[in-house]
Amino acid sequence: MLIGLTGTPGTGKTSVSKLLEKRRGWKVVYLNDLIKEEHLYSEVDEERDSVIADMELIRERLSGILEEEKGQHAEKAKVNGEEKENITIIESHLAHYITDIVIVLRAYPPELKKRLEKRGYSEEKINENAEAESIDLILAEAFEWCKKVFEVNTTGRTAEETLGDVEKIIDYILAGKENELQEYIPGSLDWIDSVP
């Protein structure tokens, strides 16, 4: 099963993904790293200090990675006699363009700004990301691209606390109990007035 963990930069995707990888042993594809390492982009945006991802190249490369992972999982299951679901997490602010199931991590824009300042982001990039968060940009895109969308508020919470919510969502999906995830249905967070 392929699950996206997405959100504006600074919402906790990487921290939670590392914990998922360690605690659950699930495969995590850190998509932004893969894009840079394997040059899966069409151009470099010097002004914004970023690259323009080539989604076609990314999908092709991910297909290969997922086939490889599927084979490794099947081999491991054969040896260990396991019948566990093969879970792969795609971690990126672009994950919702790849997966049908996505968990969108959110953070109150003023807190998001503080997190990005600690990372040394430029003021322009901080404001751009805080504004994107305040208008629900990634959440809106997730609705457009994905079949199942869940939302987790990371404001004032540690990565471990957020991990508990993400694990619960995935475990309930695996158990067929999605209807019991009402607290993660998107739309309860409204931060439109939080950024001038």
Curated annotation (Swiss-Prot):
| Catalytic reaction equation(s) | AMP + ATP = 2 ADP; ATP + H2O = ADP + phosphate + H(+)
Alphabetically, the GO molecular function entries are: adenylate kinase activity; ATP binding; ATP hydrolysis activity
List, alphabetically, the InterPro entries matched. Answer: Adenyl_kinase_AK6 (IPR020618), P-loop_NTPase (IPR027417)
Spans annotated as LID: 118-128
Positions of region (NMP): 30-53
Q: What keywords would UniProt list here?
A: ATP-binding, Kinase, Nucleotide-binding, Ribosome biogenesis, rRNA processing, Transferase
| Residues annotated to bind ATP | G10, G12, K13, T14, S15, R119
Q: Which GO terms describe its biological process?
A: ribosomal small subunit biogenesis; rRNA processing
Q: What is its EC number?
A: 2.7.4.3
Q: Which SUPFAM superfamilies match?
A: P-loop containing nucleoside triphosphate hydrolases
Tell me the superkingdom of the source: Archaea
- What does UniProt give as the signal peptide span? none
Matches recorded under HAMAP family: Adenylate_kinase_AK6 (MF_00039)
* Similarity field: Belongs to the adenylate kinase family. AK6 subfamily.
Summarizing the function annotation, the protein's role is:
Broad-specificity nucleoside monophosphate (NMP) kinase that catalyzes the reversible transfer of the terminal phosphate group between nucleoside triphosphates and monophosphates. Also has ATPase activity. Involved in the late maturation steps of the 30S ribosomal particles, specifically 16S rRNA maturation. While NMP activity is not required for ribosome maturation, ATPase activity is. Associates transiently with small ribosomal subunit protein uS11. ATP hydrolysis breaks the interaction with uS11.
- Subunit structure, as described in the record: Interacts with uS11. Not a structural component of 40S pre-ribosomes, but transiently interacts with them by binding to uS11.
| The protein's name | Putative adenylate kinase
